[in-house]
Amino acid sequence: VTRIQTTTAGSLPRTTALIEANAARTFADDGFTLQSTPEFERLVAGAVAEVAERQRRAGVTLVGDGEFGKAMSNPVDYGAWWSYSFQRANGLSLTEVNALNEPPVRSEPANLRLTSFLDRRDRQLFPAVYAEAVELGRVATAFPTTTGPISYRGHDAVASDIRHLKAALLEGEQGFLTAIAPGSAARVRNEYYASDEEHVWAWADALREEYQAISDAGLIVQLDDPSLAENFDQINPEPSVSDYQAFTEVRVAAINHAIRGLPKEQVRLHLCWGSWHGPHATDIELRHILPVVLEANVGSISFEAGNVRHEHEFTVWGEVDLPDDLVLAPGVVSHATNVVEHPDLVSQRIERFADIVGPDRVVASTDCGLGGRVHPDIAWAKLEALGEGARRAATRC
């Protein structure tokens, strides 16, 4: 019987102690860099060891650190995967106008630019829903702006992430750490570089140091890049597919620049449409972006395949030319609903992809991070359903 491997998209529920400890941390003089202490580091190390063991018990075979090194000071937080990067880059400072409150921007054909977060098209289509029902939580720090040259300063922080995860792994066990991709990091407001494209490339050069550190440690680095799909919603008015593909090709080229020379099998790309609980009616279809995404020189791709907006798109993977060595990590349990998936549904979802690439090239995963998006008890029940579904699929593939 083939064993179906399992993993997660990264974020897992933080413990109450970890959330409270993050909330109690002080800021450096810049107003957004969180200070660390030896006591805090010990708390994180212990929490990572526990979350790794809990993943194993649930049936996860490729574990991560739950993103516990990325600060969450509130139980509901959709942004820790991004806001952690502010702690790890030079060239940022707090300004009156930032990515969250900047004025709207209008794009023109062949000249696409991201508009403000408040001007996103799904939000404009459903203003009452976003005003009343879409909870986005709070991130642990304020949003800075690029006001100088971007460079990497996260060496100690990524070394801590690596140390904590490696200490939590069993002998010979592989693990992964997440890191933001250049295109997503560059969505902070740019007041320094001559163009948005230059801004993306600057982040690529800086973040390469983080990817290299994780890879050199023998771990898998997962590049979180919701921007590849999600930017479509942040361009107003809606762009043509060809213009959006050209816009996205720059972001994929920046990924390839940043991961050049790293072992392909140690690089995983996470593609998603944003994990907030909104209508997502303006999400771009997978078939329009997959050919561009497949230009990324990565060993595996993690993506949403377990929610009502994107589950039907599993067929697209069978309609494109996939590299023979590309591993697919489809989301088969989702952050998008409180309903816990039945293991037989999980198994069916896995089997669809096994039919396309073979069971040895499928690693069953979560759609997106679960931490900060669903109640912790639901998150762990979903991971148990993931583990059981993978066991059932193994008997059928």
Residues of each region from the PLM?
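Domain-level signal for soluble alpha/beta catalytic cores
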Residues: 1-397
